[in-house]
Amino acid sequence: MNINNTLKLTLCGILAVSVLNSCSKKSDEAEIQPVKEEIGMTQVTIKTSVGEINLELDGDKAPITVKNFVDIANSGYFEGTIFHRVINGFMIQGGGLNADMSNKSSGTAPIQNEANNGLSNDRGTIAMARTMDPHSATSQFFINHKDNSFLNHTGENQQGWGYAVFGKVTDGMDIVDAIADVATGSAGGHQDVPLDVITIESVTVAE
């Protein structure tokens, strides 16, 4: 295996393990939500402590995921959570930890993985983070900092399900780049944590 492939597999493993730690307390929550309801395109603004990121969520391709994200956003849950995992040239991840690195439960059931919707993990897309269980995503998400095709759906099995893309950045990639470029270290049992806390101040869904 060449160095590039080894790095990709390592980064994918880091993502899965980090989310496993933050979502491990959700096993006793309700069963997976299977109902689909197409909701069209939704505009969302993530206001962070370093700037705003505007996104368009594709409710036609990922209706379950978009509804879940919008419902959580409208509840105010994301306020005060952080981008806790940042890897330059890979992705920035947030939506599940507090500033003190403690887990924050959204109280929502895990959702069906919609990674087989034809959307790819390209630079600037937003996707759901999860555990090794393909259908375990709740609130944590990541924004791809580059094209990460190895995260795409390749088959309906544990190894091939991939990570469900449900939208893309329409404005604010400079903020994503700035977050990806921050210095990181270890904190609270996690790696690749920004040394200066990057807070999600709000996630606003357009009317």
Across the structure, where does each feature detected by a protein language model lie?
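Residue-level detector of alpha-helix boundary/anchor positions
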Residues: 15-17, 159
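Cyclophilin-like peptidyl-prolyl cis-trans isomerases
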Residues: 4-8, 23-207
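Sec-dependent N-terminal signal peptides
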Residues: 9-15
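C-terminal motif of bacterial Sec signal peptides marking the signal peptidase cleavage site
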Residues: 18-22
